[in-house]
Amino acid sequence: MAFISSGYNPAKPMENRITDIGPRKFTEFFPPVIAKNAGNWDYHEILEPGILVHVAKNGDKVFTVRCGAARLMSTSHIREACEIAKKFCNGHLRFTTRNNIEFMVDNEETLKALVADLKTRKFAAGSFKFPIGGTGASISNIVHTQGWVYCHTPATDASGPVKAVMDELFEEFTSMRLPAIVRVSLACCINMCGAVHCSDIGLVGIHRKPPMIDHENLANLCEIPLAVAACPTAAVKPITAEVNGQKVKSVAINNDRCMYCG
């Protein structure tokens, strides 16, 4: 009855059926100039570091401003990016696979105003909120794995080391004086979900010692059977440990079998 009341007709089961319940089709989010010229672009050029122009066969142009951004952003920072997009780009923006934000406009006057606005937006310490660069023969934005904020296997955090590295390499992000584009990535452990092995320079955090066991709290922090099953070398086994005169369920590590995966 619930299905019938919602409009479902048993006699015509395919009528008004929704067959795609995933994300909306990506073409719905194109800026008008890109939607108009999809598949009909003639060429593109890098006008200066971080600024590109794509020219369609009919002469239409779209100017793209690429800004470096963090992988993990605050809601206030995202809202500010949306505010910029609403002010200059009719509400359109896009994120690249290397955590850049791209703002797209269709005329040079708006482009100049957008760039001038981005250069005035700084954090309290003076660093740019939306640094322009990452195109051509430069260092692209660093991609990294999840880090301590969520993942339970990292040997190091991600955001701190990435910030420190990019502080040193910032000039190469905003210029194009290298022989070719250079990609730098960081993985917090050897699982390398950030695909650092596909980058020119990979920073990998590794565990050097077997894990220490907190027998008192282990059973309250994880499911012991899953912890045992997760070990790829069978180095973890369940035991009954004694803590403050009480027996508790815990695990023991076979150090000779441990591969330090985290």
From Swiss-Prot:
| UniProt binding sites for [4Fe-4S] cluster 2 | C231, C258, C261
Q: Which positions bind [4Fe-4S] cluster 1?
A: C151, C188, C189, C193
Q: Name one Pfam family in it.
A: NIR_SIR_ferr
Instruction: Provide the top EC class.
Output: oxidoreductase
Paste the cofactor note. Binds 2 [4Fe-4S] clusters per subunit.
What InterPro entries does UniProt report for this protein, alphabetically?
A: NiRdtase/SiRdtase_haem-b_fer (IPR005117), Nit/Sulf_reduc_fer-like_dom_sf (IPR036136), NO2/SO3_Rdtase_4Fe4S_dom (IPR006067), NO2/SO3_Rdtase_4Fe4S_sf (IPR045854)
**Amino acids binding siroheme:** C193
Q: Does the keyword 4Fe-4S apply?
A: yes
Gene Ontology terms, MF aspect: 4 iron, 4 sulfur cluster binding; dissimilatory sulfite reductase (NADH) activity; heme binding; metal ion binding
The record lists the catalysed reaction(s) as: [DsrC protein]-trisulfide + NAD(+) + 3 H2O = [DsrC protein]-dithiol + sulfite + NADH + 3 H(+)
In short, the EC number is 1.8.1.22
Give the highest taxon in the source lineage.
Bacteria
Which cofactors does the annotated protein need, by name?
[4Fe-4S] cluster; siroheme
Alphabetical UniProt keywords: 4Fe-4S, Iron, Iron-sulfur, Metal-binding, Oxidoreductase
Listed under subunit, the entry gives:
Heterohexamer of two alpha, two beta and two gamma subunits.
Q: What is this protein's function per UniProt?
A: Catalyzes the reduction of sulfite to sulfide. This is the terminal oxidation reaction in sulfate respiration, a process catalyzed by the sulfate-reducing bacteria.
Quote the protein name from its UniProt record: Sulfite reductase, dissimilatory-type subunit beta
Q: Tell me the organism's taxonomic lineage.
A: Bacteria, Pseudomonadati, Thermodesulfobacteriota, Desulfovibrionia, Desulfovibrionales
